[in-house]
Curated annotation (Swiss-Prot):
InterPro entries per the UniProt record, alphabetical: ExoRNase_PH_dom1, ExoRNase_PH_dom2, ExoRNase_PH_dom2_sf, KH_dom, KH_dom_type_1, KH_dom_type_1_sf, NA-bd_OB-fold, PNPase
Domain of life: Bacteria
Role description: Involved in mRNA degradation. Catalyzes the phosphorolysis of single-stranded polyribonucleotides processively in the 3'- to 5'-direction.
Name of this protein: Polyribonucleotide nucleotidyltransferase
Domain S1 motif residue range list: 621-689
Organism lineage: Bacteria, Pseudomonadati, Pseudomonadota, Gammaproteobacteria, Alteromonadales
Name of encoding gene: pnp
Reaction catalyzed: RNA(n+1) + phosphate = RNA(n) + a ribonucleoside 5'-diphosphate
Enzyme Commission code: 2.7.7.8
Homology family: Belongs to the polyribonucleotide nucleotidyltransferase family.
SMART domains for this protein: KH (SM00322), S1 (SM00316)
Pfam families in the cross-refs: KH_1 (PF00013), PNPase (PF03726), RNase_PH (PF01138), RNase_PH_C (PF03725), S1 (PF00575)
UniProt keyword annotation of Magnesium present: yes
Organism: Pseudoalteromonas atlantica (strain T6c / ATCC BAA-1087)
HAMAP family in the record: PNPase
Length: 703
């Protein structure tokens, strides 16, 4: 294959696409670079479908190599291991906009591997990974309705910024990634510092407009490569069988979708499916039961969508903008630092907040270096929450993605380290699920943090919106059920406060989602969000003044920087002895600030007292209680402060003559001594006899 290269300017960066040199045995491979950040994207697609395949087996793996940043991996094995959270999230980010662009009925296995081979810390890898994937698919010859463009949008000083650099993101009020085709937005992922609906929508439209540079460049690149298209045609629809199934099952399917209880509705649909399949297979033994089931699913979708578009009540009887019943409670787990139970219809989350010390922060070692994360949010989705059995183990991609979305929704209201020096971990346990458990996690997290006494800037609520569209007719749905998510055209999640949006995630399954539709969805989402916040505020409207009795308290004191070594001690011995004696955790900063974490004031007082003793200076003329540490011929050494000793000379033990030190003192003995002198070498001279009464002088004339 002849090497082909395409370069173009994209905002402040130069993008280069190259193929025909590397990974030539893959179906398609592209080396994509944005300045000096480069990724190798390979696409392999099987020409044949596995017999009985009934879903599209697309896999996306984004992987980072530490050599890309000139680093060697840590750990014993010194090689990359399981995917990091960022790698998992980026894999999902690439998957989401490309999956809906493969045609219905395409069931061939496709694997996309994106490998970061050169990384400039100022240029995030996700956008160039999406661009490279789009280019590789465009030249693969596979049926793909692309190409896809992608853009990162920042918002600083009232202006949108295209493809913000890492350092620019630190001052940006917005970090938004948008992907789409020439005519449609397909995916949005964002985190914002409480921005209005208009600003957020403007960012999406700005990103879509700018990404047309990518779409056009990839189109030209694919035309130059000119890969032959696969000889693939979707199987024609079995109209006869579809009509037969409709006649047999449409009425009962409509009745089933008037059952509001999720599990009862599920049972009714399963029974109807079994009954219909049996009837058709009995009439025609050669008929494939799997094909009947697939067409029944299409009927299911048609029934739900047609009812909504006709203005009839939704599955559970609600109108399009109505929110399910809410139930909110806080402080439900007595030994946790903060907890909440958030229930919205048949979706429920138990959320627990835990406060920790600096050493509890999560150390993230990425290509851009090591950073400590002081706020963690973990989302668990056990199989019982949907009435199923299943494997329980490490978190799956979906759980990691939902946890990160919930964290994005809360991040903007978290206090700074100076305002609240605790490390915070939140865990959301989904105990029931029927739509938008990630947004239930946002609501529950806001409640649990306030219950824990975390001074968040405002309450945050989240809501999931859906869409059913047919030609020009569309209906936006608030607080979607699982079935509405599955059978609808859009999943649109919005989190925010009463003042604005903190996170926006959007996945669109069809083209033709206009700016008007997104405006309607954002307006309806705001109304829903304000309603939920009103209910939440009735349970708890601000952070508690008192933290849980089981949460650590922080006590702070300041010492001279040259005393830090004294508090730490040789090999850390002193700091260990203080923490063990006081049952506290102690952290020392370079400027001499000491933070003591204790569950009780008395324990903190013990630690403070010991630190003050260690850092205190010995004063001449002052009396100390000390411990005899060594006996020598010429006197005894006494520890008067932790790590500070002085010498009691044999002549300073008693007023009378002392012939042997051991006759008066023993090692370990506690005695009172007076500091007589501190010489230029900081040697301390002590006296016992200065604290003793002098014996009375003998009377005159006595013999």
């Amino acid at each position: 294959m002849t090497p082909i290269t395409k370069s173009f300017q994209y905002g402040q960066h130069t993008v280069t696409l190259e193929t025909g040199v590397i990974a030539r045995q893959a179906t398609a491979a592209v080396m994509a670079s944005m300045d000096d950040t480069s990724v190798l994207v390979s696409v392999v697609g099987k020409k044949d479908t596995k017999p009985g395949q009934d879903f599209f087996p697309l896999t996306v793996n984004y992987q980072e190599r530490t050599y890309a940043a000139g680093k060697i991996p840590g750990g014993f094995f010194k090689r990359e291991g399981r995917p990091s959270e960022y790698e998992t999230l980026t894999s999902r980010l690439i998957d989401r906009p490309i999956r809906p662009l493969f045609p219905d009925g395409f069931m061939n296995e496709v694997q996309i591997i994106v490998t970061v081979v050169s990384a400039n810390p100022e240029i995030p890898t996700d956008i160039i990974s999406l661009i490279g994937t789009s280019a590789a698919l465009a030249i693969s010859g596979m049926p793909f309705n692309g190409p896809v463009g992608a853009a990162r949008v920042g918002y600083t000083d009232g202006q949108y910024v295209l493809n913000t650099r890492t350092s620019e993101l630190e001052i940006s009020q917005l970090d938004l990634v948008v992907a789409g085709t020439k005519g449609a937005v397909l995916m949005v992922e964002s985190e914002a510092e409480v921005l209005s609906e208009d600003v957020m929508l403007g960012a999406v439209m700005f990103g879509h407009e700018q990404m047309q540079t990518v779409v056009n460049a990839v189109t030209e690149f694919a035309a130059e490569v000119n890969t032959p298209k696969w000889d693939w045609v979707a199987e024609p629809a079995n109209v006869t069988l579809k009509d037969k199934i409709k006649a047999l099952a449409e009425a009962e399917m409509t009745e089933a979708y008037q059952i509001s209880d999720k599990m009862a509705r599920k049972d009714a649909i399963v029974a109807l499916t079994d009954k219909t399949v049996a009837a058709i297979v009995e009439a025609d033994a050669e008929q494939d039961a799997k094909e009947v089931s697939e067409l029944l699913h299409e009927l299911e979708s048609d029934v739900v969508r047609s009812r909504i578009l006709a203005g009839q009540p939704r599955i559970d009887g609600r109108d399009p903008a109505m929110i399910r019943a809410l139930d909110v409670a806080t402080g439900i787990l007595p030994r946790t630092h903060g907890s909440a139970l958030f229930t919205r219809g048949e979706t429920q989350a138990i959320v627990a907040a835990t406060l920790g010390t600096e050493r509890d922060a999560q150390m993230i070692d990425g290509l851009n270096g090591k950073v400590d994360s002081r706020f963690m949010l973990h989302y668990n989705f056990p199989p019982y929450c949907v009435g199923e059995t299943g494997f329980v183990g490490s978190p799956k991609r979906r759980e990691i993605g939902h946890g990160r979305l919930a964290k994005r929704g809360i991040q903007a209201v978290m206090p700074s380290e100076k305002e609240f020096p605790y490390v915070v971990r939140v865990v959301s346990e989904i105990t029931e699920s029927n739509g938008s458990s990630s947004m239930a996690s946002v609501c529950g997290t806001s409640l649990a943090l306030m219950d824990a006494g975390v001074p968040i800037k405002a309450s945050v609520a989240g809501i999931a919106m859906g869409l059913v569209k047919n030609d020009e007719n569309f209906v936006v749905l608030s607080d979607i059920l699982g079935d509405e998510d599955h059978l609808g055209d859009m999943d649109f999640k919005v989190a925010g406060t009463t003042e604005g949006i903190t996170a926006l995630q959007m996945d669109i399954k069809i083209e033709g989602i206009t700016q008007e539709i997104m405006q309607v969805a954002l307006k309806q989402a705001k109304e829903a969000r304000l309603h939920i916040l009103g209910v939440m505020d009735q349970a708890i409207s601000g952070h508690r003044d008192e933290m849980s009795e089981f949460a650590p308290r922080i006590y702070t004191l300041k010492i001279d920087q040259d005393k830090i070594r004294d508090v730490i001690g040789k090999g850390g011995a002193m700091i260990r002895s203080i923490t063990e004696a006081s049952d506290t955790n102690i952290e020392i900063e370079d400027d001499g600030t000491i933070k003591i974490f204790a569950t009780e004031r008395a324990k903190a007082d013990i630690a403070i007292s010991k630190i003050e003793q260690v850092t205190a200076d010995v004063e001449a003329g002052k009396t100390y209680e000390g411990k005899v540490t060594r006996i020598v011929d010429f006197g005894a050494f006494v520890e008067i402060l932790p790590g500070k000793e002085g010498l009691v000379h044999i002549s300073q033990i008693a007023h009378e003559r002392v012939n042997k030190v051991a006759d008066h003192l023993s090692e370990g003995q506690i005695i009172n001594v007076k500091v007589m002198e501190i010489d230029r070498q900081n040697r301390v001279r002590l006296s016992i006899k200065e604290l003793l009464e002098k014996p009375a002088a003998p009377a005159e004339g006595n013999e």
